[in-house]
C-alpha cells in the first residue's frame, strides 16, 4: 500500500476507554511495522442540559447535566498489508465509535 494513509477518528464518552482503545490501535500498527502518528487529542465537546426539578412551581430549582464527548485522532502513515489485516481483527470496546478513512 504505497503512499497511503489511514486516518482513524475515535469518539467516546469515557476518556479512559478511548485512551485504552487508541493505545491498542497504536500498538497493533507498530507491531506490524507501520509508522504511526498520534493519538492526537481533539477538543472535547461538552453538551449541557438544564432541567426543572419541580413539575409545577419553583423555577429556581434546577438540575444541570453534562455529557462530554472525547475525541482522538490516529494517523497510520505507511500501512502494510499486515497492518490492515491486524486492524480488521482488532476488537475494541463497545463504547468507542470508530471512523476510518483512507487518504
Curated annotation (Swiss-Prot):
One of its GO terms (biological process) is translation. It holds the Pfam family Ribosomal_S10. The keyword Ribonucleoprotein applies. GO terms for molecular function: structural constituent of ribosome; tRNA binding. One of its GO terms (cellular component) is ribonucleoprotein complex. The keyword Cell membrane does not apply. Keywords: Ribonucleoprotein, Ribosomal protein. HAMAP family: Ribosomal_uS10. Part of the 30S ribosomal subunit. Belongs to the universal ribosomal protein uS10 family. Involved in the binding of tRNA to the ribosomes. NCBIfam families: PRK00596.1, rpsJ_bact. This is Small ribosomal subunit protein uS10. It comes from Alcanivorax borkumensis (strain ATCC 700651 / DSM 11573 / NCIMB 13689 / SK2).
Amino acid at each position: 500500500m504505497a503512499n497511503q494513509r489511514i486516518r482513524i477518528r475515535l469518539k467516546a464518552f469515557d476518556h479512559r476507554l478511548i485512551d485504552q482503545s487508541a493505545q491498542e490501535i497504536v500498538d497493533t500498527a507498530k507491531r506490524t511495522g507501520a509508522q504511526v502518528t498520534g493519538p492526537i487529542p481533539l477538543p472535547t465537546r461538552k453538551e449541557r442540559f438544564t432541567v426543572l426539578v419541580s413539575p409545577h412551581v419553583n423555577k429556581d430549582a434546577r438540575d444541570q447535566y453534562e455529557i462530554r464527548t472525547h475525541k482522538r485522532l490516529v494517523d497510520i502513515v505507511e500501512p502494510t498489508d499486515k497492518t490492515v489485516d491486524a486492524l480488521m481483527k482488532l476488537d475494541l470496546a463497545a463504547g468507542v465509535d470508530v471512523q476510518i478513512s483512507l487518504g
